[in-house]
């Protein structure tokens, strides 16, 4: 990956041993930016990186991503054209065939329709090329860590799906390219929706979206929709019962339990808050950035829990926010821990994301354990 940016969000990552020789930076001067000369340096910079890797006995990548930020957004740079020019510069040489793709990391678009991680996912899957379809192959897209030990994989395997591919489990670039043979895609994160739409348009791979939610009734409805669309049978009664049992266990042990919820967690803070309230718990405060897609949750929260307060993490005045005076019994999310340092906390931000009934069950158990450990 070649960075043409401020690098403030990547310098720490690139210093980690596992990322050595995978991140490179192209220095630019102000005159280069003003005149546009920085764009002419990109093909040579890519070639220099590839030659460095070759000369040092490192693995030559199959693709190079050019990571750019707000500078070129303001300049209106056509990065697709820049990448095509960089690929053309490699044609005829020893590095011919290496793909070059843009990676838009515009902080300006973070609250827009296409935030950076939407672009990243779309760029990654744009590398897939047409391939003969396999009726027993499915892709699970949206996460960068694998779904492990979830009922979703079990349901698909019982339905005769032989290949359940995730980008995080692909050991080689060739294995990644085999994702193009999928009969359909399962989208588990809304930020991958644009990538799924692109794959449907380019490779004729349809998709179904299974949103990560914490309402067991909604989870059941999603699995029924998956079964109908995919033409498979799914019996989720046992898993649903286990999740409901974990909810009941927590409610019985801690009746009237009150939560504060942050957004630095494996959940949509507003959906999680609404689900907890419908389970019979209470939510005092939510620390999260409100986006249009969350209005439906806020509307229901206003009806079911009008006293719940919402604080925007992006609001500058949060600098003056004092330690929460909430009477909450437990918090979920690392940011909630910051605002409520003296209240038991469940970070719930592991790399391997929870999903479905397993996610509900594990979260209830984590909250139970945190309260028990705190002596509540």
Language model feature labels by segment:
Residues 1-376:
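An N-terminal assembly and electron-transfer interface module characteristic of large anaerobic redox
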């Amino acid at each position: 990956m070649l960075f043409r940016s401020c690098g403030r969000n990547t310098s720490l990552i690139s210093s980690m041993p596992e990322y050595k020789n995978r991140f490179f930076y192209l220095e630019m001067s102000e005159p280069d930016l003003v005149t546009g000369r920085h764009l002419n340096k990109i093909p040579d910079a890519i070639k220099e990186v590839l030659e460095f890797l070759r000369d040092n006995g490192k693995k030559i990548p199959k693709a190079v991503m050019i990571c750019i930020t707000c500078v070129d957004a303001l300049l209106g740079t056509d990065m697709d054209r820049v990448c095509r020019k960089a690929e053309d510069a490699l044609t005829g040489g020893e590095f011919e065939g290496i793909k070059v793709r843009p990676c838009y990391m515009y902080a300006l678009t973070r609250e827009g329709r296409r935030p950076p991680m939407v672009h990243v996912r779309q760029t990654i899957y744009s590398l897939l090329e047409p391939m003969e379809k396999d009726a027993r192959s499915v892709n699970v897209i949206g996460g960068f860590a694998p779904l492990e030990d979830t009922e979703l994989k079990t349901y698909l395997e019982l339905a005769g799906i032989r290949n359940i591919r995730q980008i995080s489990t692909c050991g080689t670039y060739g294995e990644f390219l085999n994702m193009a043979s999928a009969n359909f895609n399962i989208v588990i994160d809304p930020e991958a929706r644009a990538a799924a739409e692109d794959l449907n348009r380019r490779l004729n791979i349809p998709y179904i979206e299974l949103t990560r939610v914490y309402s067991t009734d909604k989870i059941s409805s999603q699995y029924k929709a998956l079964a109908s669309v995919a033409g498979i049978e799914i019996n989720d009664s046992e898993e649903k019962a286990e999740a409901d049992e974990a909810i009941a266990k927590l409610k019985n042990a801690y009746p009237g339990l009150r939560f504060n919820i942050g957004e630095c967690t494996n959940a949509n803070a507003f959906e999680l808050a609404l689900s907890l309230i419908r389970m019979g718990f209470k939510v005092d405060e939510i620390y999260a950035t409100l986006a249009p897609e969350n209005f439906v949750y806020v509307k229901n929260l206003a009806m079911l829990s009008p006293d719940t307060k919402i604080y925007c993490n992006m609001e500058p005045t949060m600098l003056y926010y004092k330690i929460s005076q909430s009477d909450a019994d437990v918090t979920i999310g690392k940011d909630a821990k910051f605002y409520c340092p003296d209240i038991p906390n469940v970070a719930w931000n592991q790399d391997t994301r929870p999903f479905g009934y397993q996610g509900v069950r594990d979260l209830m158990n984590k909250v139970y354990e945190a309260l028990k450990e705190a002596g509540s």
